[in-house]
Amino acid sequence: MRTTPMANASTIERKWLVVDAAGKTLGRLSTEVASLLRGKHKPTYTPHVDTGDHVIIINAEKIELTGKKLTDKIYYRHTMHPGGLKQRTALEMRTNYPEKMLELAIKGMLPKGPLGRQMFKKLNVYRGSEHPHQAQQPEVYELRG
């Protein structure tokens, strides 16, 4: 009887990938990056093991949103003090905190729990086209569609 090969921590080979967010839609980019972080693009994907690659996203400030989401979508956070609910529109987030906007979208698409937190640590988001990970020799990854 044959068994399905399962990946473990010692057999995983991770690559560093660079994704350019310029002109890409937030949700479409986020789903593909979440899939890369989970390792679902690899034939060795195993649900209970972090088989994903490291992903570097550049040009985060040039991300696009469709429809009226720039003005209508609201991001909420709480200061943990009474009456401390704060809100920002997507336009304010893209202008002031584009990295956070992408991170929140991608984090919501990863598993909730210790494995999802470990996957999220492999994500690096930067404004502009420069990043400090040249030593890892990242490959440019072209998104589908």
From Swiss-Prot:
Covalent S-S links between cysteines: none
A molecular function GO annotation: mRNA binding
Coiled-coil region list: none
GO cellular component: cytosolic large ribosomal subunit
PROSITE patterns reported for this sequence: RIBOSOMAL_L13
One matching Pfam family: Ribosomal_L13
UniProt GO BP: negative regulation of translation; translation
Transmembrane segments: none
The keyword ATP-binding is assigned to this record: no
Keywords of this entry: Ribonucleoprotein, Ribosomal protein
Entries under NCBIfam families matching the protein: rplM_bact (TIGR01066)
Family classification: Belongs to the universal ribosomal protein uL13 family.
Subunit structure: Part of the 50S ribosomal subunit.
Function: This protein is one of the early assembly proteins of the 50S ribosomal subunit, although it is not seen to bind rRNA by itself. It is important during the early stages of 50S assembly.
Matching HAMAP family: Ribosomal_uL13
The name this protein goes by in its record: Large ribosomal subunit protein uL13
Protein source organism: Bacillus pumilus (strain SAFR-032)
